[in-house]
Amino acid sequence: MTTVQPPGAATAPEPTTRPEALSLLGAAARHDPYAFYRTLRAEHPLLWDARLEAWLVSRYADVAPALAGSALAGPRRGPCCGPGTVRCAEEYTAPESAFALLREVCARTAHVLARRLAGRQEADLVEEFCRWLPTGTIAAATGLSYAAVMGRSGPAPARSRAEAPAATDLGRGRGGTGVALLAARCADQAVLTGRALASLMANLLANPEQLELIRAVPALIGQAWEESLRRNPPVHVVLRRATSDLAMSGGTVPAGAAVALLVGAANRDPDRFADPDRFDLHRTTAGALALGPVDCPAARVAELQAECAVHALLTAMPGLRAADAFDPAESGLLTRAPHRLLVRPS
């Protein structure tokens, strides 16, 4: 039996199971994408998905260089960076003072949201905190309404970076125009950051010993953020098109073909990360495919929001723990995150 191929495919991997039954749009992938990813990595590192009409690429050794290289073309519009981006494409450079002031805005916003939950018997962190903090921070910093920011934000916005608001439209925000411009440039990532925050809190609540370590050593929040982005990235699938023939494990993607780079699979590849399903904030292996490179303003803002979020929650709710009905089940296809996180604030 050979892999189902599109017309004109160059070469394809030799499967050990029925590849035609495997699809990113199938029930198995929806039910447990991580088990689906394991099957792909082990048996079908390059698989033609007839339903998706794209090649699925699942191994880290293939996904990472493909994301960083120039053989795959992506959309011309959207966020400046994404998983695996080596260098930020954003020409705007924010001064360090803008990041510091934006952190102050984010910290105030996070503490307001956290205090609202502190006296409750039970709360949903996704609905009442994680979704609000990134957008609320941007709204406060820019002077734009929450609805206006939400209208700009999304995992794949259909507008160019040049469409950011003009400085004259941002004078009502806290911290001045510099902070407002930085926040506005990061609005595209607000929804993704909210999903990443939900995954971070899910990982910490599911690992109480590591949550206690964070309480004792808040400086570890950054490491926890990086590890959560590896284990549960907000972006699971990056869609691209091959501009030339591209060699992968098990075959070659022909020029012009659609390619689905499975970031969620690559970040749990045991050939790259030891015990990849485990959340370990002391993990030292670098190279996780996350939100963007270190020089990306949006990635830096997302990290400072994560630090402010965890600090505010643990300050306002020293006894924060998972509720009895805690079930951090993820949902989504291209992007994934828990849709509910029930906790006991006290």
What residue spans do the PLM features occupy?
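Cytochrome P450
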Residues: 1-346
